[in-house]
Amino acid sequence: RKESSAASDVYKRQPYDAFMLEDDGRIDEKIFNEYTSLSLRYPPRFTQVSTCEEALSQLSSMPYDLIICMPGTGDNEGFDVARTIKAQYEHIPMVILTPFSHGITKRIANEDLSSFDYIFCWLGNTDLLVSIIKLIEDKMNLEHDVSEVGVQIILLVEDGIRFYSSILPNLYKFVLKQSQEFSTEALNAHQRTLRMRGRPKIVLARTYNEAIGIYEKYKNNILGVITDVRFPRVERGEKDALAGIKLCAAIRKEDPFVPLIIQSSESENVSYAAKYDAAFIDKNSKKMDVDLRRIVSDNFGFGDFIFRNPDTLEEIARVKNLKELQNILFAVPAESFLYHISRNHVSRWLYSRAMFPIGEFLKPITWNSLQDVDAHRKIIFEAIVKYRKMKNQGVVAVFKRDRFDRYSNFARIGDGSLGGKGRGLAFIDNMVKHHPEFDEFENARVAIPKTVVLCLSL
C-alpha cells in the first residue's frame, strides 16, 4: 500500500515560479501543517531544482515518488524538458503545474500531454499540493483497496484544468475532514487509523471513455459521480456538448440509486439533472465550493444520517453513529424507513463511514427483494449487533461512557499498563476471536466477562 512517506521532487523552471509556489520558502512547513490539521501521516519532503541537469542528478541519487514540473509563463521549452525527464523515469508519476494565464492555456491546448499523468493550474493554494499527492496515492492504491477492503470511489469527470484544480482541493479537504469525524467512532487509535484509510477514494476522469471505463470496472464500489457536461469522448478529441448527460444516462440504466451530480456553466442543463434524478451545481455561482460540499454531504452519505418525511423531506430523526442507529431503528415511522431503505441510503451511509462488512451485507437486501418493513428493521438491527460484537471482540477499547453497553467487551480507562490480570483477560479475548472453533460447542459460549480495566496512569 502506497503512502507518501518518501520525497516528492518539485522541479521548477524559473526562480519567480519557485517563489510564487513557495511564498518565501515555507512550502514544507505549509504541507506539514496541512497534513497535521487533517490527521494525515507521513507528510512528503520536497527537493527543489531549477534545471534539467539538477533534476536528473537528484533522480539518479535517491528514489522519488513524484515529479512536479513547473514550466514558466514565458518558457517554451518546459514541456520538452519534462518529457526528457519522464522518458528516463517512466515509472515515476509526473505532474505539470502551471501558473494560470491565457498564454499558458493556449500553449497547453496545442501540446501533446499524453506523457504526463496530470496537468494542474496553480491558483495560489497549498491545498492543491495535498490534493495532487492524495490523487496519485488513490490511483496507486485503488485496485488493492477496492478488491481487498471494499473501499468506495467518488468519480469526478472534468476536463477543464482550471476547474478540477479548484474542485479537487475542495473535495479532498471535505472528504478528509469527514474521515476525521467518523474515525472518532473507532474503539482505539489503531482502529481510528484504519477507518481514516478507508475513506472514499477520488478518481479523476477527463474523457467519456475513461469515465465509463472506470464506472464499468468499479460499478459495485461507486459512492457517487460528479460530472461536467461538455468534455471529449476520447483523449485529444473534439468536445461532445452532451457527454456528461450521456454518461448519466448510461449509469442510470445500470443503477437507479447511485448519486449523480451534474455541474455545468450552462443553466439549461438543469433539466437533464431532473430527468436523471441528479443534483445540479451552477459553475457560474460564486458559492460553487459551498454548494459542492453541501450536495456531496447530502447525497453521498456523509455526516449524520437524517431520517426524513418522504412527502415534506422534513427531518424526523438524526443519528450520529452506529449505536444511535441501532437504538432508533424500531422507532422510525414506517413510511420514512421505507423511503430510505428503498434508495439504499443506509448502506451508502455505512460505506461512506468505512463500515464495509455491514454495508456489503445490507446493500443487496433491497426493498424489492424483501418488501417487509419489520423484517427489514430486524435484519439491519441484527447486522449492526453482529458487526459491533465482531469489532469489539479481541480489542482493548478506550472507555467512553456513552458507548459502553451490553455489546461492548473490553475497555480501559487511562493510558498506563493494563496490569497482569487485565492483560491476561485481553489475551484470552484475543485468542477467542482468532479461534472460531470455540463457537462449535453446543449449548456453551466461550467468552470473557464484560471488562473495564483501570490502567496505572489515569
Question: What residue spans do the PLM features occupy?
Answer:
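Output/docking surface of receiver
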Residues: 1, 48-50, 72, 95-163, ...
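Short mixed-charge
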Residues: 27-39, 176-199, 437-442
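Acidic di-acidic motifs
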Residues: 12-18, 24-27, 51, 158-160, ...
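Single conserved hydrophobic/aromatic residue that forms the stacking wall/gate
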Residues: 2-7, 11
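Nucleotide/phosphate-binding sheet-loop regions of phosphoryl- and nucleotidyl-transfer enzymes
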Residues: 361-458
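Terminal, compositionally biased segments used for targeting/anchoring and flexible tails
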Residues: 268-392
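Amphipathic alpha1 helix at the N-terminus of the CheY-like receiver
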Residues: 18-37, 57, 162-173
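Conserved phosphotransfer microenvironments
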Residues: 20-28, 32, 42-43, 48-56, ...
